[in-house]
Amino acid sequence: AEREIVRNIKEKLCYVALDFEQEMATPAASSSLEKSYELPDGQVITIGNERFRCPETLFQPAFIGMESAGIHETTYNSIMKCDIDIRKDLYANTVLSGGTSMYPGIADRMQKEITALAPSSMKIKIIAPPERKYSVWIGGSILASLSTFQQMWISKQEYDESGPSIVHRKCF
């Protein structure tokens, strides 16, 4: 039940700040920042800069003690590991997907952060389709409907015999 409450707060009140430091400088009691939320027991809580501080961990995982790159750096690093001939297309066609990509402001922030990392001549385009919350599921559904998908199936026996490498052999 508590997870559902947190998920509901996340979906209704949280957003990604375009400029985290500037947003933090906004007075904590600013009426534009504070929002009320009624808990199931009727208690009303006020949520202030937590609305954007929590999603900021996507860009600054160190906030929660994680030693990993932010989502923008991971995206940039992934593009840079690809063949140089396709990087331009990847920069111009970065598609957000999954429930966490539904935060208001995430596409603009990704645009800003990747633009800062990429070569200045590169055209950056972040695509945030409205149905992105379910696009991973939709993609899996499309894959499963392909006539060629059955040849990618892996039985437990095959996996036990070959380990994770069977995925690369059958699917790539």
From Swiss-Prot:
Task: List the SMART domains hit by this protein, alphabetically.
Answer: ACTIN
Q: What is this protein called?
A: Actin, muscle
Q: Does the keyword Cytoplasm apply?
A: yes
Q: What Enzyme Commission number does this protein have?
A: 3.6.4.-
- Superkingdom per UniProt: Eukaryota
Location in the cell? Cytoplasm, Cytoskeleton
Upper lineage is: Eukaryota, Metazoa, Echinodermata, Eleutherozoa, Echinozoa
Q: Which PANTHER family match?
A: ACTIN
* Main EC class the enzyme belongs to: hydrolase
Q: Where would you say this protein principally sits, based on its record?
A: cytoplasm
Q: Which family does it belong to?
A: Belongs to the actin family.
Q: Which reaction does it catalyse?
A: ATP + H2O = ADP + phosphate + H(+)
